A protein has these predicted regions:
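Polytopic transmembrane helical bundles with strong interfacial aromatic enrichment
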Residues: 1-178
Length: 178
């Protein structure tokens, strides 16, 4: 699994390097009126910076033998990267297909829902890394306990992580269809 994660990270990094090079090229040549959307260039460069930081955190995570703080930072930077890339995709699609979006008004409820969803995902990441840390502490204190028993030794807040995960799923489905 670790090798697969590294390979995936390298593929994402290379893809973002290509994205950034194309964004700089399109900005310089004003391809498809690209200069009128400087946020795309800024977001592309920002995604390159964030993927480098995420990669360095991933390497540190391996070297630190899954340190909880590094793991949490790595996950949060990965979430930020996905958010930036999502913005780039949406903004690019709107730029290329401007006629489809002419006259379309911003939906403030959808915007607030997406921000709320993002905050819930951050809480989910923090809960998940906290549970993992507590599991590691239980396994150090009780090395002979089977994995299932170690999980049972955790406080009831472990269920909040699962409950929030299902809540995120259903909230995402709800947002998609409304």
């Amino acid at each position: 699994i670790e090798y697969g994660n590294r390979l995936f990270g390298v593929l994402v990094g290379i893809s973002i390097i290509v994205l950034t090079v194309l964004a700089i090229y399109y900005y310089k040549t004003n391809y498809n009126n690209f200069r009128s959307h400087p946020s795309l260039l800024f977001s592309s460069v920002l995604s390159l910076i964030v993927v480098i930081i995420t990669g360095l955190l991933g390497a540190e995570l391996v070297w630190s033998v899954l340190d909880t703080f590094i793991k949490t930072l790595h996950m949060l930077f990965a979430l930020a990267l996905v958010s930036i890339l999502s913005y780039i995709c949406i903004k690019s699609y709107k730029m290329i297909n401007a006629k489809l979006f002419r006259g379309l008004k911003k939906n403030p409820i959808l915007s607030k829902s997406l921000i709320f969803l993002w905050v819930l995902i951050v809480i989910e990441i923090l809960l998940g890394t906290g549970i993992r840390t507590n599991l590691e502490l239980v396994s150090i204190e009780n090395p002979s306990l089977p994995k299932g028993e170690q999980l049972n030794a955790l406080s009831p807040y472990k269920y909040l992580h699962s409950l929030l995960g299902f809540g995120l799923l259903f909230f995402s489905i709800y947002i998609n269809y409304h």
